[in-house]
Amino acid sequence: MDIGLITNKEDDEENDLSIKSPYSTTKNQNNNKTKDEIIKKDFISNINYSNNNIYSNIYNNIFNNIFNKFNTNNNNNNTTNNNPNNNNNNNNNNPNYNNNNPNYNNNDNNPNNNNNNNNNNNNNNNNNNNNKNYINNKNYINNNNINYINNNNNNNNNNNNNNNNNNNNNNNNNNNNNNNNNTSNNTSFNKQNNYNNNNYNSNSSSRSNNSNNNNNNNNNDDNIYNNGKNYIPNNGIINNHSNNDINNSYNNNNNIQNYYYKKNNNENKKKNNDNENNNYPNFNNNNNYNNYNNNDNIINNNNNNNNNNINNNINNNINNINNINNNNNKIIRQHPYINNENQQKHQKKIQHQENSNFEQLEKPEQLSHNSESSKTTILNENNSYLKNDKIMLSPTQQQQQQQQQQQQQQQQQYLISSSKYGYNNQNNNNNNGNSNQESILEKKKKIRKTRYFENEYQKLHESNIKNINNNNSNNNNNNNNNNNNNNNNNIYNEEELSLNTSSPIQSQSQYQVIYPHQQCPSSPTSSSTSTSSTTSSSSSSSSSSSSSSSSSTSSTSTITTTTTITTQSTFQNQIQLPQPSPYNQFTATFINSSNGFIKKKEKDAKKQIKVVTTLLIQHLISNNVTKFNVRLIESLLNVDFFKLKEILDIMECSKLVRNDKCNNYVWLGLDNPEFLNFALSTFHSKINFITKNSEFFCDNCKLNSENGVILNSPILQFSNVSPTLLSPSSSTSSETTTSTSTTTNNTSTTTISPSSNVSVNNSYSLVNMSDLYNGGSGGGSSGGGGSGGGVNNNNNVQNNINSGRKFRYKETELSTTVSQFLKLLLSDKCLTIHDVCFNFNPNIEKTHDNYISLRNSAKIKRCYDIANVFEAINLVQKSKSVEETRTQNYKWIGTTVLTNEYCQNNCPYILQENYIQQQQQLQLQQQQNQPKPPR
């Protein structure tokens, strides 16, 4: 049964010379034109609605190629067909007929005739399967990707048909050429193969082939109303139109071709009926069953393989489409801006569809809001339309239509309820006849509606964007976690092959420095083990710059690292960590601790000098770093750059670091000879570095200076530190003897050279002590209280002074402040800021008001910073006093070497006396060892 698109089909076929396209709007004005021109015009008219001119140009080119191929095939089929019935029938009418045509095959026993017919039947079956696949997927026909899937299915099956035709016609070169020419056009459009098959079958005289034609026509009609489903409007849902335009235009072109093929098939039916009446011989009765079975097996195998691939592609695409629809349903919303006139039109359309079970498709009007505040116009997504064509709906399409009707009814009810909300007085205004007021109220309604729905849409859109961003961030985090886990697994596997080591881990809230003597105080010289727990801020730096000489052990309860530092002859200026007094076990935990000394946030805490100093020293000691860059430390520890520079300036003045310029520094350590030199020289100096007045903290120095004892000791050496930690001097001599004097643990051993003309290996030499103790003035007295020692005129002493100038700091305000504050700390008493204020200003009366004014001066504030740096390094202990002033007390702790007793016992006058005694002993030994002269 044929389901046609045009009523009175037989009258149209017999009487009308022009062929009407199912999408054509032309009637009688096309009578004088040819069929091809009419179809081409109708095809182009269905494309011109598109806003994109690029698409129309593409379609015109495609159309010209199709119809050129169509005309050539139409002519060639009359001359190259294997069935002689067609040639006998069109003998008089066909100008291309030639009895001597090489393509004409008049062999009654030719087996290829049946092969071709069988192939045509198989092609029809394949096309029927394609149409079934197309109909099965019609539920997704409104989606953009389904048309593409169906086109792929048809193209794949058409390619199978091409292969089958080529395999079946290998016996005859002429037939092979004809089949290749006929089937090469199959790839142009999806339904071109139907046309070729129908022409073959129509030229035969068998009833079975006529029935196949009817089946093909039915399938073509099914394709037409399924293609028409693409034009059903989506109730105002805003969508992208580009893909729909392309797919709809392809479907329109297919429908036009199918219509034209249908006309030709109907004409061929009549010709076949005439052939039967004239009793022409039928060559199709000579069947070759062996070839048929072989071809059938080949077709089935190819179809099975291709169908499996096609089904997999369809399933994947359908899953993607479902995901897209699920996301779009959350964002896309039916637009409510429909006027009353448009509502009535939609209601009439729904009633007409319910009564007639036909769907009349019209081009949707461009909906725009009439209010002045509306800034956007809303376009319906359906750019393509049909006019005055009635298409029968399938059951699944009827279900979709009912769902659309329900959505429209809900939309109308929502609009009616929203229009009545808050405007109950509108009827009264209508009764009064105030048209101006009505228009104003309507405008206000529309403005409020637009604002309401725009706000809702924005909320939905923002929420969807947030969800998308959250999903992306979660995916990125998951990927990063997976990568980290993989890296950790690789690292763990590599570590299992080597020694059992573990990286240091510590909570983010603790910044702690633990010195090696807390675990191994018995062996401070040979080796020292340090247990350091790192922080979160320095974990990255410690992992990247961990020393190869450190080995770590892991336990089940806590994870710590024990670093073993061995004193070797190749290392110089190695870190020698201090030995604290029994009452001080230094641990700097200052964040998220109840007893901590900082209660601010971590961000503010990292701007404080004490916190930054603790992080810096911890990083340097735990990672065994000697040379570093300030910018690199800033990025690793995430601290303030300017605070870090202030700390390093104080440490440079204290001889704890050395500046190598360009923000490069060298960490010298707490027991380096430069720091010991600096501490001894400041403690035994006889002046105040701030006021330049006479000031003595060493009793022996004060007594000897008052008695007029001249200090002539040129060289001062320290052997308490391991010799490997000292850099050797340039000059050497074989005439060196040493005498050591061992004291208690708090004191150190000193090595004195036997004469001033000899310098000692592995020692740091100092300038003349008189020069240092005079505050760097180069000798002479400054202020009252004892005469200053003069510089020795010996040349070797002068060379030692020149070599010692590298240890002399440049006198600046900060250096003088650091020197004087350190001198006060080494005086072995609890120092307060009150004492510092009046020590720096001795001429001011010691009152509370003066103390408050002096406390806010720049130098005293710098003393606060110096005290915080020394406290973080564990050189000073800070505590609050109980007095009314509530000032802070500072107690000097020092290092394992530099203590108050060490400073007192290493007075330069005492060293000078020991030096003189040693010289006298050497002279006596030399006199005794000399041989007696002969008499």
UniProtKB/Swiss-Prot annotation:
SMART domains: E2F_TDP. Residues 74-227, 275-287, 397-414, 522-559 have a biased composition (Low complexity). GO terms for cellular component: transcription regulator complex. The keyword DNA-binding does not apply. InterPro entries: E2F_WHTH_DNA-bd_dom, Mucin_signaling_protection, WH-like_DNA-bd_sf, WH_DNA-bd_sf. Residues 1-32, 74-228, 265-287, 342-376, 394-414, 466-491, 516-559, 727-755, 778-799 are annotated as: Disordered. Gene3D superfamilies: Winged helix-like DNA-binding domain superfamily/Winged helix DNA-binding domain. GO terms for biological process: regulation of DNA-templated transcription. Residues 262-331 form a coiled coil. Keywords: Coiled coil. Residues 265-274 have a biased composition (Basic and acidic residues). Residues 367-376 have a biased composition (Polar residues). Residues 778-791 have a biased composition (Gly residues). It comes from the Eukaryota. This is Putative uncharacterized protein DDB_G0282499. It comes from Dictyostelium discoideum.
